Amino acid sequence: MENELEHLNWNIKHALLQLEGPLAQELDSCLEVSPGALSPSNSVYQKILDTVQVLDKLLVTLTPPHMTLVDGVFAFTNSKVLLCASEYALADHVQKLQPCSISQLAEATGLHEQGLFQIVRYLREMGYFSQDPKTGLLSNNRLSNLLRKDHWATWINWVDFFPREYYDLLSRLPDQLRSDQPKTATELFYNTDKPIYQYLAETGRAAGFHKVTGTGSVVEAPGLLADYPWEEVKSETVVDVGAGVGDFIRSYLEKFPDATAAAFELPSTAEILKQRFPDDDPLTSRIVSITGGDFFQDPIPESSVYLLRWILHNWGDEDCIKLLRRIRETMVIKPGVSRVLIIESVLFDGRLGRGARYADIRMLARCRNKERTLGEYRKLAEEAGWRLNRVVSPRGCLTQIMELRPVGACTGSPRANGNGNSAGGLEWESELM
């Protein structure tokens, strides 16, 4: 085993020298996902994900158990340190001062220098900020840039939200798990019997929730709009069922100047959505309708293309099947065109499935529901009159796009040149696994 480990160490160190040296610029280019910069090579990005997945498995295999346990026990420290970085706008100050010393940063932020040094040291070990090995001066890097309040992706909204209220909320998760406890951790934390989304609306917390979900829409839009073949539905009105406050619709219409869309949401959220698309907004004329209602009871707008983004994970299997059947019954059938696009975080093993596992516990605590595996989504689809035709894993996203086609209503058969149901093979443009 010693020889194998020596060989492994040599190869890893050699790869690091290349990736941090002559390949650094190319790597940065491949990892940058933004509205104005998206590498034309999706295949290289997927190879990077393959490598991350394998290295994570290697890390899990080699790490001594006590180190893994300690990491789990103190994982909350990561969230709280990131919260400090956000609270005091460290990345924003570094951006103005860079390169800067800890003393300069402490003076600019009004923070205790020793405490700031410890926070920055922790952040550096997480990968945030670059530090000159000779001078010790700090600069932003591709990771710390995500903490800037002026960054296009607004990730800072997540950093401000989840380590605060959600952190406190999860303290009630052990209570929820008792077999005699009918309430969720969220209901216990807020001391309410009302459904969570109703409670958020009635207590003025809905705006903060939509701000966070809106960030997810903004962050994922470049990859979602680049890596799925939207040209196949360019002549159709895409109905966003559960559209939130319209962040995805805005990105979609901005990306495709000839596209049209429609939104279906709860009445209170639909009103907010209408306010975000006033008459003088040039995109408003391409929004066919904004409808308020209950998608289990009220009529859903007719179309041949529907989008459900971060919707099914809120509901149990029976409700998911009911909703998918309602859409199937409402859908305008156009062979080769009609489809519903399910955008969710699919559960799978390894590092690349970690985001979905985080979300799975959030859904458990929020509404006693869950994220699902690809097999579970396939089963839901089949029971509701659909078939899973294609799965796409877009760049820069925490989600996958699952394309469902109505059974018996479209020509062709599911394509199958993917790389299997593994995260690394998630060039799942894969089309059917």
UniProtKB/Swiss-Prot annotation:
Region (Disordered): 413-433
EC assignment: 2.1.1.-
Pfam families in alphabetical order: Dimerisation, Methyltransf_2
One GO process term, biological-process aspect: methylation
Gene3D superfamilies: Vaccinia Virus protein VP39, Winged helix-like DNA-binding domain superfamily/Winged helix DNA-binding domain
Binding residues annotated for S-adenosyl-L-methionine, in chain numbering: E265, G293, D294, F295
Effect of gene knockout: Abolishes the production of all diketopiperazine derivatives but leads to the accummulation of large quantities of L-7-dimethylallyltryptophan, as well as the trans- and cis-isomers of L-7-(3-methylbutadienyl)tryptophan.
InterPro entries reported in the protein's UniProt record: COMT-like (IPR016461), O_MeTrfase_dom (IPR001077), Plant_O-MeTrfase_dimerisation (IPR012967), SAM-dependent_MTases_sf (IPR029063), WH-like_DNA-bd_sf (IPR036388), WH_DNA-bd_sf (IPR036390)
Protein role: O-methyltransferase; part of the gene cluster that mediates the biosynthesis of hexadehydro-astechrome (HAS), a tryptophan-derived iron(III)-complex that acts as a virulence factor in infected mice. Within the pathway, hasC, with the cytochrome P450 monooxygenase hasH and the FAD-linked oxidoreductase hasG, convert the hasE-prenylated Trp-Ala-dipeptide into an O-methylated diketopiperazine that is then released from the hasD NRPS. The HAS biosynthesis begins with the synthesis of a tethered Trp-Ala dipeptide by the NRPS hasD.
Protein name listed in UniProt: O-methyltransferase hasC
